[in-house]
Amino acid sequence: MAVNKGLTLLDGDLPEQENVLQRVLQLPVVSGTCECFQKTYTSTKEAHPLVASVCNAYEKGVQSASSLAAWSMEPVVRRLSTQFTAANELACRGLDHLEEKIPALQYPPEKIASELKDTISTRLRSARNSISVPIASTSDKVLGAALAGCELAWGVARDTAEFAANTRAGRLASGGADLALGSIEKVVEYLLPPDKEESAPAPGHQQAQKSPKAKPSLLSRVGALTNTLSRYTVQTMARALEQGHTVAMWIPGVVPLSSLAQWGASVAMQAVSRRRSEVRVPWLHSLAAAQEEDHEDQTDTEGEDTEEEEELETEENKFSEVAALPGPRGLLGGVAHTLQKTLQTTISAVTWAPAAVLGMAGRVLHLTPAPAVSSTKGRAMSLSDALKGVTDNVVDTVVHYVPLPRLSLMEPESEFRDIDNPPAEVERREAERRASGAPSAGPEPAPRLAQPRRSLRSAQSPGAPPGPGLEDEVATPAAPRPGFPAVPREKPKRRVSDSFFRPSVMEPILGRTHYSQLRKKS
């Protein structure tokens, strides 16, 4: 019976025992993870038929391998059934203990994530409150204390000022200050002339003046008095500068210099402005029509010159009228206006520079139209003529008042040409005298040469030695001069000054290049 009973127990009548693998798979965390993995695998498998066929092949392979492994491991499992049972019981007890210690294993992943999020947010909120609340409370306390202190100090100061003003000494001090300020205002009104704006008020303000006004405070009265004094000071300085300018204009020589400076400044400004308006890279447009308008531009430039002169005269008249009138802006306003004009001219010159460079490039490449070239050339010639006139006047004045030696041009090496190359007649006579061997009865006179040419030198100083020119002719020998032996003429040492100039009448001072040109022409 015992054997039969054991056989029946082995056949399956044993009570069912818990399996560790089943319990682990039944845990909400593991089951949820498995479901998520299964959904991902299914969606990936359904994405493409090729992927589905590959996955099915792998599934069949895994199933066949698992069935083969179970069939091969079955004898081993039967022999080690007791050991597997003991290990299963031990694992179940450990799983029970783990579930007691970690209750989160009994909840799904969504719930665990939400609870974890709430826990983290509450912890962060509590940490932030623990830091910010003390700081906010402390700052509120500090600001409240500072505000209370300021209000207390302001109240104390106001009460003190009111108390001091209500005392006898305060009343006396305020009355004295009021009296002194009133006396100063009366003195200023008596000494200083009233302004036109204040003396002639608008009719709309007359009714407002009739209405009673509150007495201005001491500070406002002091400010008005200071404003009046400063305005009068500026006006006085402007009048003094104007009178000094008028007195300086009476000095001889100042008026021409000032007018010349004003004219130069106006010409320069007009040249810059006209150049800015004209230079717009004109050589990029209308290249063929430029040559046909040359004659018209010449006439136009003459008309423009007359118009420019008229504009200059009108501008000078306006400038003189403005200078004669008292400046309403005063000294500071004039300085500011001058600085503004200077800044504007600087900016205009800077902006005009690129266009000027492009125009210059066009002129170099012969692409600039004739109108622009002719007008620019005309203005440049007018400016050069004006400068030349000024220099001529200065030179004439210096020559008139300063004694200078009169200078004229002298032909270089003209005096010593006959020494190096004597005439043929002189050589013949010298040869006959030497052949005869007889001493000369008297000194043989040197051949008298003709006067030098008069094309470049009108007269010659009596002390200078005569020198033959290009057109000189050999004259007949003169009467013998007793007492002068016939000595061959020696070539004196040449000086640098002899090759360039000789004192004579007032003639232009020229160099070697100019002299060579004049010599070729003669």
From Swiss-Prot:
Going by the entry's taxonomy, the superkingdom of the source organism is recorded as Eukaryota
Subunit notes for this chain?
Interacts with ABHD5. Interacts with CIDEC. Interacts with AQP7.
Q: What is this protein called?
A: Perilipin-1
Q: Which disease is it linked to?
A: Lipodystrophy, familial partial, 4: A form of lipodystrophy characterized by loss of subcutaneous adipose tissue primarily affecting the lower limbs, insulin-resistant diabetes mellitus, hypertriglyceridemia, and hypertension.
Q: Where is the composition biased (Basic and acidic residues)?
A: 414-435
Q: How is it modified after translation?
A: Major cAMP-dependent protein kinase-substrate in adipocytes, also dephosphorylated by PP1. When phosphorylated, may be maximally sensitive to HSL and when unphosphorylated, may play a role in the inhibition of lipolysis, by acting as a barrier in lipid droplet.
Source species: Homo sapiens (Human)
Which controlled-vocabulary keywords does the entry list? Endoplasmic reticulum, Lipid droplet, Lipid metabolism, Phosphoprotein
